[in-house]
Curated annotation (Swiss-Prot):
Natural source organism: Saccharomyces cerevisiae (strain ATCC 204508 / S288c)
Protein name: Azole resistance protein 1
Topology class, membrane: Multi-pass membrane protein
Induction of synthesis: Transcriptionally regulated by PDR8.
Region named Disordered: 1-38
Subcellular location, record wording: Cell membrane
Keyword tags: Cell membrane, Membrane, Transmembrane, Transmembrane helix, Transport
PANTHER family, alphabetized: AZOLE RESISTANCE PROTEIN 1-RELATED (PTHR23501:SF198), MAJOR FACILITATOR SUPERFAMILY (PTHR23501)
The family this protein is said to belong to: Belongs to the major facilitator superfamily.
Transmembrane segments: 71-91, 103-123, 135-155, 164-184, 190-210, 222-242, 299-319, 330-350, 376-396, 415-435, 444-464, 473-493, 582-602
Superkingdom assignment: Eukaryota
Membrane topology (Extracellular): 1-70, 124-134, 185-189, 243-298, 351-375, 436-443, 494-581
GO biological process, alphabetically ordered: azole transmembrane transport; transmembrane transport
GO cellular component terms given for this protein: cell periphery; plasma membrane
Length: 613
């Protein structure tokens, strides 16, 4: 009737959804074979380029379209990266307010763990729904988590908000690199990955400064409120300027003018997939959605892997703090965690490929495909990245703690000391991208970066309460060089190992790119918790040995609170104990970098494919 709002039936939404699905599938042509014959050679160069926005002319985006898409991706990635680094300067204030320093590592891990575990899932979600729709959904989830964190009234609520933000941040990080890699040819991906990595590094610069200013001048809650306007800007930039299939400036502007209808199409597309799942349960019973969960999204491996790593991290968190290391609770958590992770690997590598339905359905692939991961060129660089990230996040976090706990610096002043580390990360990422573009070499960059990591971590162990101002700057440069070089090169080194002629190249490309993100984020998650455990255990042991009794008991929480309210100089007994405990953390980081170098040496010598111009 006139005046009544229009409603959509199941069939209506199915129709619109099928229409959106057909358009999405048309836009997601992934393979373009370009053949180039020259007069000077009889050889035919073949370059297979993965494209997410293949148009009718099969041309990659250029000019304004390319730059606008990259800006949208870079800002989205900046948003996710900002939330990692901005919390490094609020640790003391949050611990003081909630009295939970032993759980402070979960400010990083609560964000990084879902970032790691869900990295492999986001690519699977994006394939049927569309990369654009999925990216927008990820930004919305991230914003919800940020708002919860800003309003938190307890450590548990704050960690919960960080977990939700981590779910969205994971989608942003995973899809940014997947989408970005489809916008240019293989030979130019090094530069593109460097540009996106720089947005991460710039967030690393801005994050601690913003966190320090907010914590010192306003409140630490603004470290999360600031994500809301930045996230809104990223959302609309990506909504307007990333449009697969549109190759000209005029087409993009026409598309922006059609924003209402475009937004409705996105909602209809998402609604179609949700109703399709609902329709399966009503019309076809439980079998088809169950099969999709088991084989399309590999839910069994995901549950085993998530539960396993969560148990392991909980054991590291509570061990030596709430429970003794040899207590039954900690031992059981370790055993269950390790068993579940091993079962996840066995299931994906050995059991999953044996199912007949998997053999008959090409798009049913495990989250971690042994066919790809077992390749030395992929396995070695990603393990090296995992170890480097674990060491780097440990150094990054406790460098801030060094200046706050030993010298009683404010959050803002402590953040200033990170500039040397972060600038070296940015410069290295850009330089490595340019070198790869010119020489097509990757392994030398990976090995040299790992060597710098070992040397830098070794030198950083000299950072104690006797170090002078020049040491405060110089000792932080090499860790940034190591992280910037390896984070930029490992993804490209993994991608070039894939067979471009394989019928599963598209899914393999997405899988390997997200696996690289998985290793990076898992390294940060484990590094954040393990470094917190090492510091706490070392500090308690040294306090007990020195027979120092704190007013409210010998715990790391009481140590930090007492130090803040009763600062007695950098060379006092407490100052020496904290300095020695921080040195133990830096030695742990050195161990991570040393292992990373071993794997980097065995990286593949394969070069990047030359561009056809």
């Amino acid at each position: 009737m006139k005046g009544e709002p229009k409603t959509y039936s199941m069939s209506d939404l199915s129709y619109y959804g099928e229409k959106a699905q057909q358009q999405n599938e048309k836009q997601q042509k992934q393979y373009v074979v370009r053949r180039n014959s020259t007069q000077s050679t009889s050889k035919q160069n073949v370059s297979v380029v993965l494209e997410d926005n293949a148009s009718e002319s099969n041309e990659l985006p250029k000019g304004f379209i390319l730059y606008a898409s990259l800006i949208a991706l870079a800002l989205s990635l900046f948003l996710a990266a900002l939330d990692i680094m901005i919390v490094s300067t609020i640790i003391e204030e949050v611990a003081k307010q909630f009295g939970s320093y032993s759980e402070i590592g979960w400010l990083f891990t609560g964000y990084s763990l879902p970032n790691a575990l869900l990295a492999l899932i986001w690519g699977r979600i994006a394939t049927p729904i569309g990369f654009k729709e999925t990216m927008l959904f990820a930004i919305v989830i991230f914003e919800i988590g940020s708002l919860i964190s800003a309003l938190a009234n307890s450590m548990s609520m704050l960690i919960g908000g960080r977990v939700i933000a981590g779910v969205g941040g994971c989608g942003i990080q995973s899809l940014s690199f997947v989408i970005g890699s489809t916008l240019v040819e293989e030979s130019q991906r090094g530069i593109l990955i460097a540009v996106l990595s720089c947005s991460f590094a710039i967030a690393s610069v801005v994050g601690p400064f913003l966190g320090g200013v907010f914590t010192s001048s306003v409140t630490w809650r603004w470290c999360f409120y600031v994500n809301l306007p930045i996230g809104g800007l990223a959302f609309f930039l990506f909504l307007f300027f990333y449009n697969p299939g549109l190759s000209t400036f005029q087409e993009t502007m026409d598309n922006i003018r059609k924003f209402p209808s475009q937004f409705i199409e996105i909602v209809r597309n998402v609604a179609y997939h949700l109703l399709k799942i609902k329709g399966f349960s009503k019309l076809n019973g439980w079998r088809k959605p169950f099969m999709e969960l088991i084989f399309m999204y590999d839910i069994i491996e995901f549950v085993f892997c998530s539960a396993g790593f969560t148990c392991i991290l909980l054991a590291f968190t509570f061990g030596g703090n709430r429970y003794a290391w040899n207590s039954a609770s900690i031992i059981i958590l370790f055993i269950i965690g390790i068993v579940l992770v091993v079962l996840a690997g066995i299931y994906d590598f050995l059991v999953f490929p044996k199912f007949n339905i998997v053999k008959a359905t090409p798009h049913y692939q495990p989250l971690m495909s042994w066919t790809n991961i077992k390749k030395p060129g992929i396995f070695t660089v990603n393990i090296a990245l995992f170890l480097t990230c674990a060491g780097y996040i440990s150094q990054f976090t406790y460098i801030v703690q060094y200046f706050q706990l030993i010298y009683n610096d404010s959050a803002w002043r402590a953040a200033v000391h990170l500039v040397a580390c972060i600038i070296s990360t940015v410069v290295t990422a850009i330089l490595c991208g340019a070198i790869t573009d010119k020489t097509r070499q990757i392994k030398p960059i990976i090995v040299i970066s790992s060597i710098f990591g070992v040397v830098g971590a070794g030198i950083l162990t000299l950072l104690n309460n006797n170090a002078n101002n020049s040491a405060h700057i110089g000792l932080l440069i090499l860790p940034g060089v190591a992280f910037g070089g390896l984070a930029q090169s490992s993804m490209l080194a993994s991608q070039i190992q894939l067979d471009k002629k394989s019928p599963t190249f598209r899914s393999d490309f997405v899988s390997i790119t997200t696996f690289n993100t998985f290793c990076k984020n898992l390294g940060q998650a484990l590094g954040g918790v393990i470094s917190n455990t090492v510091f706490s255990a070392a500090a308690i042991k040294k306090l007990t040995k020195a027979n120092i009794q704190l007013p409210d008991g010998t715990t790391v929480d009481n140590l930090v609170i007492y130090r803040q309210t009763n600062f007695d100089g950098s060379h006092s007994k407490l100052g020496n104990i904290i300095s020695e405990s921080l040195t133990d953390v830096f030695y742990m980081a050195l161990g991570f970098y040393a292992l990373s170098l071993i794997f980097a040496v065995f990286a593949s010598n394969k070069k990047v494919t030359a561009s056809l111009r």
